[in-house]
Regions:
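Short coil/turn segments at secondary-structure boundaries
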Residues: 89-93, 190-191, 240-247
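Short, hydrophobic/amphipathic alpha-helical patches that form generic packing surfaces
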Residues: 30-41, 107-114, 174-178, 226-233
Length: 265
């Protein structure tokens, strides 16, 4: 990058693979600081880790501190130099559950700053294609969970548990806040230990230090669940049962969090 500001594409062309691991805090701003370091050193790190993914390695580990001002300048350079489409794609793909997402994004950004805004359109390029694969996975999960989230009543609040591969709570937020504008509810992502909480019409995304255990559903809720399961089983015409079709529309990994499927999980 040039000074503390933007990325210089001429310097990006002198890129080399480095036997070093970046370690950052897992936040988007922290990732942007990894991007800055990569450009400043003209290097592609061997790996980029968060504390949760840290493991034994023979390579030196470089701690990348999160600097808010630096991260803001890096992010501003995306829109200014690469365009809104690239800014959107990088921001969205950071929510991917792929363990190598940071490395894929850094490789793409080096290419994009070298070639310009049109890089994002080169979907067949080996450093561009993975970004669309991550986006496809995110879009697919968001679409599925908009229909498959099952709420239970817990002490006057609606609660649901999900196990997504990607961190999709920020992407689910507009849908469920629009669907339940007057309700108090929470959606707990048990994989990423995060909660989407709406209370008194205020919505927050919270990262938890420990797993969350929801209280048992109320007796009234259990009665409704029993009725729903009975309705679900009665609705099906057994002679037309299509297990392949059912698995296609509702993959088995969703079943554990769906009331009507728990008996079959």
């Amino acid at each position: 990058m040039s000074g503390e500001g933007t990325v210089n594409p001429q310097r990006a062309r002198r890129l080399h693979d480095a036997d070093v691991v970046y370690l950052y805090d897992g936040s988007f701003e922290g990732f942007l600081c990894c991007v800055f370091e990569s450009f400043a050193q003209h290097e592609i790190p061997f790996a980029v880790w968060t504390p949760q993914r840290e493991t034994t390695t023979l390579y030196p580990v470089k701690d990348i501190p999160t600097d808010h001002a630096r991260a803001q300048r890096v992010f501003a350079s995306f829109g200014k130099k690469l365009g809104a489409e690239t800014e959107y794609l990088v921001s969205r793909d950071f929510l991917s559950g792929r363990e190598d997402k940071e490395l894929l994004l850094i490789r793409f950004l080096h290419l994009a700053f070298a070639l310009g805004p049109g890089t994002v359109k080169r979907t067949g390029h080996p450093d561009v294609a993975p970004l669309y694969e991550m986006k496809k996975s995110l879009d697919w999960e968001v679409d599925k969970f908009q229909g498959f989230v099952r709420f239970e009543e817990h002490d006057g609040m609606l609660g649901a548990v999900i196990h997504p591969k990607n961190y999709i709570l920020p992407l689910l937020r507009p849908h469920f806040c629009g669907r339940f504008p007057e309700e108090d509810f929470l959606i707990y992502d048990a994989v990423h230990q995060a909660v989407l909480l709406q209370q008194e019409r205020k919505t927050r995304l919270l990262e938890l230090a420990a797993p969350l255990e929801l209280p048992p559903p109320s007796e009234r809720e259990q009665q409704f669940q029993a009725l729903w399961m009975q309705f679900y089983k009665t609705l099906e015409i057994q002679a037309r049962h299509n297990e392949k079709g059912r698995m296609s529309h509702c993959p088995k990994r969703f079943w554990a969090d769906m009331v009507e499927m728990k008996d079959e999980f």
